[in-house]
Amino acid sequence: MKAKTLIDAYEAFCPLDLSMEGDVKGLQMGSLDKDIRKVMITLDIRESTVAEAIKNEVDLIITKHAPIFKPLKDLVSSPQRDILLDLVKHDISVYVSHTNIDIVPGGLNDWFCDLLEIKEATYLSETKEGFGIGRIGTVKEQALEELASKVKRVFDLDTVRLIRYDKENPLISKIAICGGSGGEFYQDAVQKGADVYITGDIYYHTAQEMLTEGLFAVDPGHHIEVLFTEKLKEKLQGWKEENGWDVSIISSKASTNPFSHL
């Protein structure tokens, strides 16, 4: 089948025009006219995922994080550039779905809500009329530490960071969540009455500002977005069966999380 057939189906579900302004999105390398027999879904494109794609004879990679985010001035061989050069050398096309999969109803932030049993979820921060990034909803009343433990468990994490002073452990019931690095949206969580905000990459001073505003937070890291790989694989497999596509779909097993904890 042609790559375009699969991508057209994906964009019917998750349109590119939902992406935030200035985002990198869509086909980034290769051609939509190429024949594809194997597709791999990954969160990131690093040397390990490229090696995995080459080993598995992948024709198309669908990634959340673009391998080219800033303009390139050259493609001279280097450890970073070789990631791209290897993709070109092995004729592997790359398609990027970044903030549009965060925003689309039934996408990544809704998958997070399903895992954490967040009910009555609506968007956190409006990006265009009727759509927004992040989600805010309710859970049964519980202690902050109980929620943090659940986040650790469902995302299979060694640790999470709690944003609180003096080991406070308040009861919470209204939760905001945004995958990736969502610190910039914390004011939306405050304005909409959230007790706690779950997001990654929270900066030191942002954490202090949150607490001053009465907002607690749980920082599970950026890498919880890896949920994208298995959930999108499930969706593509469903479309494959419905449409009789002759293509194999795999999710990356390579680790791209650069952090670990002692």
From Swiss-Prot:
Pfam families: DUF34_NIF3. InterPro entries: DUF34/NIF3 (IPR002678), DUF34/NIF3_sf (IPR036069). One of its GO terms (molecular function) is metal ion binding. A divalent metal cation 1 binds at residues 102, 225. The keyword 4Fe-4S does not apply. Keywords: Metal-binding. It comes from the Bacteria. Homohexamer. Belongs to the GTP cyclohydrolase I type 2/NIF3 family. This is GTP cyclohydrolase 1 type 2 homolog.
